[in-house]
Amino acid sequence: MRRRPLCVVLVCMILGILCNAWINTKEPVSYERESIHFLCELEEFVKKDNGYTLVVRDVKGENSFSCKKIKLYANENTAMPKELHIGNLLAVTASIHSFEKPGNPGQFDEYKYNTELGITAQGFAGKIEIKKNTVKNPEDFLHRLRNQLQDVVSLCCDEKTAGIVSAMVLGDKSGLSDEVKQLYQENGIAHVLAISGLHISLIGASLFFVLRKYFMPMQGAAVVTMVLLFLYGILTGFSISTQRAVIMMGCMLLARLAGRHYDGLSALSFSAICQLLIHPMVLFQTGFLLSYGTVLGIYVFVDVFCDAWESKNPIWMAVAGTAGIELVTLPILLTAYYEFSILSIAANVLFLPFMGGILVTSLAGIGLGSITLFAGKFCFGFAHFCFMLFEWIGNLFVKIPGAVVITGKPTDWQVLLYYGSGVLFLFLQKWKQKKIFLLTLAFGVFVLFLPVHNNFDLQISNLDVGQGDCSCIRTKNHTILIDGGSSDVNKVGKYRMVPFLKSQGISYVSYLFLTHSDKDHTNGAVEWLCAANQMGVKIGTVILPKLNEKEEAYCTLLDELRNKGCNLMFMQRGDTVTIDELRISCLHPYPDYEWKSANDSSLVLKVNYQNFTGLFTGDLEEAGEKEIIKKLSHVNYLKVAHHGSKGASSEAFLEQVKPDVSVISCGKKNRYGHPHKETLKRLENIGSKVYRTDKEGAVSFEYQNGKWYLSLWKKESGKKRLLSDW
């Protein structure tokens, strides 16, 4: 440390940022405006299939409205000019909204992500006009050049190859399919899909070598290399990893010019200090942590492992470097993605040697493809072959039982103990006692993988899926889902249901009950079942209501499930499923039930556990309630039917069940007006405590050691509190 003062400065800086973040826990500022007119400067824009995404800054609007940056979305209904240029002064009419905090455990935190980038709000533009046609020429030129190069890639490659090349070389991930992202993530090689230090090092070193050898002296070659790398960074969007790599390459070239020794850890620290001075909150971004953790793992652990085993063999050094990366970044990956690839070291050792060739031939393909498509296609042939090979090997790896381990999100104390063990490991390795320091490392990994998400006897969670339904029941050994869909959240299975399950360490769902065939109860489940490898979370049995008279939507759902080879089971009145101490009884429907509304054919499930009784009612309405009302008595918990519609939860029904607590699953400001005032009034009249997913986020009840606990994810950040009246 004495020889590396920059490392000390960085540590002090990080501690200061952490203390500041802990002390300043302000409530987010509300930017809600239904319609507002404002002036702003265009910072960047990206064309999407359904319109544009723009980032604008220096926003000043009517009624003293102002903020630093806003992310704007423009679609086919937005009135806007045909051409936009970075630097344009825009006059915008839009609705402005604050970023939502996550409503469920495991859900992506768009509020945290955007605020760390300095973007304070989002808006949906109705009209965009150019007020002043100012243009930032270098940035705008590079932006347009990037679009032209993307067109070249698209013309020379098939869609899948073009998406990967654009991500790796041009920094544009919009063309990557979900299947490719998932495959690379499950194999632990998702980092190759981003422009990283590997790319910058290869490009920078090659440029410097060629310029110095054939064109100019060392000083000139270093300056030109730095300028070109900086422009390449702007061209590709200057991501966090690109910024780090460019700064570190600059430090290396400056050391070369000054005739000084290049110290990687000092350069890494200097790069981090530069980024944190500009955006301190970027410290909490997964991309920042992974980028710096990767390089730190290489610098620290390659020498440690090579010295311990007294080997400088290139293959062993590659394994040591990859192992070092995994050791440093493991808690970051588990905190962000909740899963870990056992074969990631092998995948990296196999795939990384190809990256130099892929990068060189891809750059050549882009350059030559701009002149003649034939030459471009020829150059991209190597990349296409490599990606096919990666896909084939990657699919083999993920099919190996236990290749991907879903651990759940580790707690803070687990992460601290893990890194504490890592620091102790580094001290012990100086003694050359392999067994001792390996045991220390093994202890850290063991602590990190400890299951901490099922320290309860029973858990019932109602997820925030917008205008839809999804409930999760967990025992010590099993997980059951009741419904899974939404009418206003896109890809609800991918972005809310599966992340929740993975964050809790769940890799297998024993039973999935689909109460009826409405999309807002099923589309997330179908999306999940139809995804590659079921997004890593398997489903045992799908249970549907047993009906003689089936509507078209029910038949369509049945066909989809059968086509995916799902294990199906049908329930009717009187059927039961017993799981551990949990008993799930079907109260409705019976096969000959003649329903007028498909909602009234919903599965109605009574859940019994010791002295607890819960009732799940799907979208059951008053006509269906009359079929079961005589079979009902007091329940502790009611999942309110049909999102709180006034046509459900009749007075007679509620008087019969008199639930202690009632949970309503509905979307924020939904177009149906759910929950209706009449329903809320009826629940109030019987003295039932009401919780709503649109206001409180995920609502969870846990039974542990004879006591019930409640946690509200959005309203109370998931903190448990004792329910004294249960």
Range-by-range predicted roles:
Residues E116-M248, L253, L327, Y511-F513, ...:
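Aromatic-rich juxtamembrane segments at the membrane interface
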Residues I189-Y214, Y508-A532, A641-A652:
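Di-metal (Zn2+ and/or Mg2+/Mn2+) metal-binding site signature of metallo-dependent hydrolases
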Residues K519-R562, N567:
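Active-site HxH/HxHxD metal-binding segment of metal-dependent hydrolases
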Residues K491-F500, L514-T515, K519-C530, P589-P675:
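Active-site-proximal loop/helix segments of hydrolase catalytic cores
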